[in-house]
Structure formats: structure tokens, C-alpha cells
Amino acid sequence: MSEKYTNEKYVVTWDMFHMHARKLAERLLPASQWKGIIAVSRGGLFPAAVLARELSIRHVETVCISSYDHDEQGELKVLHAAQTDGEGFIVVDDLVDTGNTAKEIRKMYPKAKFVTVFAKPAGTPLVDDYVIDIPQETWIEQPWDLGITFVPPLARK
């Protein structure tokens, strides 16, 4: 079902992310079964764009749930919700971690297919499909959260 990775930090490049998101799109074929995509903002916006392109889906909604402030998980707040029960929709997020957000998503969209690119053990039972297994204690650095910076050559240190 998925690939495994173990380490304290997992740095995802844009190329890796795109490859994994396309793999997820392949699993969602045929595209004709879907009415649209619901992206879990903000992390789900990136895989939603790839899925929308690969599956030729134009109807993209969002559900905006706030739970993280950089690396700290806090209280869930639903800021905006797509108005559907999810039937015929793919709900996509970048990651399922503790499962707190996923539980709320399942309540809101019980008939949707819920997928993520990455999954940690606590959240795995709550999604219908995912691409990469990540250990619970591993922090994922997503490419949209990173910047490119100069690193001096080792010989100069």
C-alpha cells in the first residue's frame, strides 16, 4: 500500500511531493467517478492542485480548519466548510497525523473519499488511502514551508 520512512525529520522536496501526489491521483482513477475535490486548507491545497490537474477536475472546494501553529498542534477551529456531505468528492490533505483533524473531516464529509499523501500511525485508520507511512514521532518539513538559503562550503568553517 505505501512506502515507509524512518527518521526524526523528513524533508520533502517539490519533486518528491509531486511524484507522491501523482501516485495518489493514479489510485483515484477513473476520474469520472468524482464530482470534485475538497482541499483541507492549507496543507491540502498543494496535493489538491496536483489531483485536480491529473484527474482533470475543475470543481475544487476548501474546508479551512486551523489546528497547527508551525509545529504545535492546538484546538481545532473550523473557519470555512464546503457545503456537501462529500458524496462523489475527494477530500485531500497533505498529512494525517494524530487524527484530530481527520475525525472532524469524517464527521463533516461522511460520504467522501479521504486521502492524504503522508500518514502517521495514529491517523492511518481515518483515511481511505495514502502514499507514504511516516513514524508518529517524525516531523515532516513540507516544501512550501521551506526556503532556499546559502550554506557556506565545509572548507570555510
Curated annotation (Swiss-Prot):
Q: Which reaction does it catalyse?
A: GMP + diphosphate = guanine + 5-phospho-alpha-D-ribose 1-diphosphate; XMP + diphosphate = xanthine + 5-phospho-alpha-D-ribose 1-diphosphate; IMP + diphosphate = hypoxanthine + 5-phospho-alpha-D-ribose 1-diphosphate
What Enzyme Commission number(s) apply to this enzyme? Answer: 2.4.2.-, 2.4.2.22
According to its UniProt record, this protein's enzyme class is transferase
Q: Where in the cell is it found?
A: Cell inner membrane
**Where on this chain does Mg(2+) bind?**
D94
Keyword Membrane in the entry? The reply is yes
Topology relative to the membrane, per the entry? Peripheral membrane protein
Q: Record-annotated residues binding xanthine?
A: D97, I140
Which keywords has UniProt assigned to this entry? Answer: Cell inner membrane, Cell membrane, Glycosyltransferase, Magnesium, Membrane, Metal-binding, Purine salvage, Transferase
Q: Where does 5-phospho-alpha-D-ribose 1-diphosphate bind?
A: R42, G43, D93, D94, L95, V96, D97, T98, G99, N100, T101
Quote the Gene3D superfamilies the UniProt record gives: 3.40.50.2020
In terms of InterPro entries, this protein maps to: PRibTrfase_dom, PRTase-like, Xanthine_Guanine_PRibTrfase
Pathway in which the depicted protein is active? Purine metabolism; GMP biosynthesis via salvage pathway; GMP from guanine: step 1/1; Purine metabolism; XMP biosynthesis via salvage pathway; XMP from xanthine: step 1/1
Residue positions annotated to bind guanine are D97, I140
User: What does the subunit section of this Swiss-Prot or TrEMBL entry state?
Assistant: Homotetramer.
Q: Which family does it belong to?
A: Belongs to the purine/pyrimidine phosphoribosyltransferase family. XGPT subfamily.
Q: What is this protein called?
A: Xanthine-guanine phosphoribosyltransferase
Instruction: Write down the species.
Output: Actinobacillus pleuropneumoniae serotype 5b (strain L20)
Organism lineage string:
Bacteria, Pseudomonadati, Pseudomonadota, Gammaproteobacteria, Pasteurellales
